[in-house]
Amino acid sequence: MKPLPLPKQKNLRADCAWVIYQILEQGKSSRECLERVQRRHNARDNAWLQEMSLGVMRRLPLLQHWLRSLLDRPLKGNKKVIEHLILLGLYQLNFSRVSNHAAVGETVAAASYLNAAGLKGLVNAVLRNFQRENLADKPVDDAIINSGLPKWLFKAIENAYGDDAEQVHNETNAMAPIWLRVNKLQTSLAAFTQALDKAGVEYTLSANHADAVILTKRVDITALPGF
């Protein structure tokens, strides 16, 4: 696959699609690609870029299954990145807190920043059809797709763990909790947890680490008190 230059103008979703393209088509590392695009975005947007791009990777088998069922034929050449933009749109619609209106509208608009304004209609149609057909509610009869794992890893776990493989698949896909360490040079544990209570952020305290706070739900890190 030919190298794809970074979009000339910054755009959150176009840049995220570029990152996904670089990882899947060019074999680049997520860290390397994210560092390039994050230089031109603020902290809040950088957190979003990381959450979305890595989220697509985590749900890739299912997202690709949906994409194949929605596209008549694969896109080729320099338009291939639009498939990755659509993957991002599908992820937003089904696995993120992004509103459906923004997930569709902003993703469609991002095609212009990827030199594919002529494919905006295709992006819109695919995402609308995903909603219309309620694909997210239709069960997928494929253990590998449902596991969310690459085929080689799925089979390796099956061979190694036998009857316990399903539990291992589930644990592999579980998102780790976020741990925070309170900097006592800046604030106290009591003051920080009070701020979390006020912001409605759910957490627990660690029995083994006196300065640690464990967030029980995924949140936008940049929205935490004191960020």
Region roles according to the model:
Residues 1-227:
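Class I Rossmann-like S-adenosyl-L-methionine
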